[in-house]
């Protein structure tokens, strides 16, 4: 729910939703609530969470249009750098990537992905169905768009996730959620299958594929949604799903109000209902991880900034504490910066920063939580580094050797440390990633190893090595 546009529309029906049981005819064993409270739920251990955030400030909202305060890229990167612990992967979730925007949208998101991955972050894309006039219901057209997204973004090894469609179970808010459009369920199924097929075919091993679920609508609608995935997706769909995303906003959307600290129960209820009640309907078992793709708490009129910090800490620690219990591997906060801090509509105040980039108390809270709880493997999920060391020997006796670093990850290289045997030769920090080695003085009696230590954006590193031929006598 990265766009709080749905809040007012939900207000009229939330009371009915809250009163109804969360299971339905297609639930595994009748009515299914999951775990409504954290009390008594075991906190099983699990790997540390991979954290992230939505860096954009734009948020849709019901009511009069309020202009978004434009993003300032250098200040955004500076804020992210303050938030980001060293040697820790931080995933930036880029939302509102609409099929309707065509090539212009692809170009814009390619530029955003490059900006953030060049700075050392991982990127995840929310690939929206959101059709233009004349596209609605054209599932084959959306599938072609999804395949193109894979082909265009997959070569960037730091683009690690594609969320196909957005909140298809939510059907009354076309700006925020794809469920309002004809063919959305089929677009989800076919899009996930196509995205996974294309990543496998192209060998983009780092690129995972998932879809998300909005917590929550009425139980009958939820059972119908998950039953549709089962009946129309089947084993092919299940095999293509790497993860299922959860969008949950306790104290803002559902439930619309929580007492301070009650957000812990809200997160447990949302995660457990997804894991225990709904994923099994579609055949998505315990081996499919859950990503908390969107979780937030806005400030604004009657919503204090200190309360945001408290809610953030409560919700993050709940996900951390029960990650092993429910198989949660990832967490994303929505979002970094306010849409417009001068707006009287609280829906424009989701950020950890105000629109002038000054921090709210929650910024420091999230920074501290990342430092305490985040996964410490900067290369987690990325697969092997795609670099190679090429040598070209010059003509003539004892001619120099030209060495070049090549490969798909070459744009991510930040430094090369070059050595021959025990002797350090050079440190290279700029393109071209090439250097010349003079072989005079290398004894033909010895074997020499050329080693190049490549350090990449984000802290990853690898060593490339080749045997170096000495000059013949």
What are these regions (language model features)?
Residues 8-19:
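Bacterial N-terminal signal peptides
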Residues 387-395, 401-473:
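Long, low-complexity serine/threonine/glycine- and acidic-rich segments characteristic of extracellular
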Residues 267-329:
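Catalytic-core region of carbohydrate-active enzymes that cleave or remodel glycosidic bonds
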Residues 31-42, 65-77, 168, 302-307, ...:
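Aromatic-rich peripheral "rim/lid" segments of glycoside hydrolase catalytic domains that contact
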Residues 25-98:
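Boundary/entry segment of secreted carbohydrate-active catalytic domains
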Residues 43, 76-87, 107-123, 149-157, ...:
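Acidic (Asp/Glu)-rich catalytic clusters
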Residues 49-55, 90-94, 123-125, 160-164, ...:
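Hydrophobic faces of well-ordered beta-strands that scaffold small-molecule active sites
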Residues 69, 73, 103-108, 131-272, ...:
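Active-site cleft segment of glycoside hydrolase catalytic domains centered on the general acid/base Glu
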